Amino acid sequence: MYSEIQRERADIGGLMARPEYREWNPELIKPKKLLNPVKASRSHQELHRELLMNHRRGLGVDSKPELQRVLEHRRRNQLIKKKKEELEAKRLQCPFEQELLRRQQRLNQLEKPPEKEEDHAPEFIKVRENLRRIATLTSEEREL
């Protein structure tokens, strides 16, 4: 069966038209052999050589240089380590500490709006309040 297929292909090859290079006709342009790009440029040769070496070693075309892989691996490990530390810091806080932080934040929020209102108040009102405080302090000192 295989030999029959080979015979058929050989017969087809004989039927195909071949250019007649033997006949010399001055009007015809002789075909030139195409240049192999691998042999044509030095950079292409080096690229081809590198690809062959990578193929022999079993490396893919998409693989990165070793230094770049190591740097990415370190960055990834640092990010993972940082995230783990943050999660552990949150877990290690006891409920008492968490409640203290919440109360501290609430107190800070409650203290901030009056300061803002005082900043927007006219100066004569601020001076008047300062005078009242001083007056109350001096009266308390007199009582003592």
Curated annotation (Swiss-Prot):
Residues 66-112 form a coiled coil. Widely expressed. Expressed in neurons. Expressed in malignant glial tumors. Expression is reduced or absent in a number of cancer cell lines. A motif (Nuclear localization signal) lies at residues 74-84. Residues 105-124 are annotated as: Disordered. GO terms for biological process: actin filament bundle assembly; actin filament polymerization; cellular response to glucocorticoid stimulus; cellular response to nutrient levels; cognition; negative regulation of focal adhesion assembly; negative regulation of G1/S transition of mitotic cell cycle; negative regulation of long-term synaptic potentiation. Residues 112-124 have a biased composition (Basic and acidic residues). The keyword Ribosomal protein does not apply. The keyword tRNA-binding does not apply. Changing P19L: In renal cell carcinoma cell line. It comes from the Eukaryota. InterPro entries: FAM107. Keywords: Actin-binding, Cell cycle, Cell junction, Cell membrane, Cell projection, Coiled coil, Cytoplasm, Cytoskeleton, Growth regulation, Membrane, Nucleus, Stress response, Synapse. GO terms for cellular component: actin cytoskeleton; cytoplasm; focal adhesion; neuron projection; nuclear speck; nucleus; ruffle membrane; stress fiber. It holds the Pfam family DUF1151. One of its GO terms (molecular function) is actin binding. It is found in: Nucleus; Cytoplasm, Cytoskeleton, Stress fiber; Cell junction, Focal adhesion; Cell projection, Ruffle membrane. Interacts with ACTB. Interacts with COMMD1; this interaction stabilizes COMMD1 in the nucleus. Interacts with MAP1A. Interacts with PRDX1. Interacts with F-actin. Belongs to the FAM107 family. Stress-inducible actin-binding protein that plays a role in synaptic and cognitive functions by modulating actin filamentous (F-actin) dynamics. Mediates polymerization of globular actin to F-actin. Also binds to, stabilizes and bundles F-actin. Involved in synaptic function by regulating neurite outgrowth in an actin-dependent manner and for the acquisition of hippocampus-dependent cognitive function, such as learning and long-term memory. This is Actin-associated protein FAM107A. It comes from Homo sapiens (Human). The gene is FAM107A.
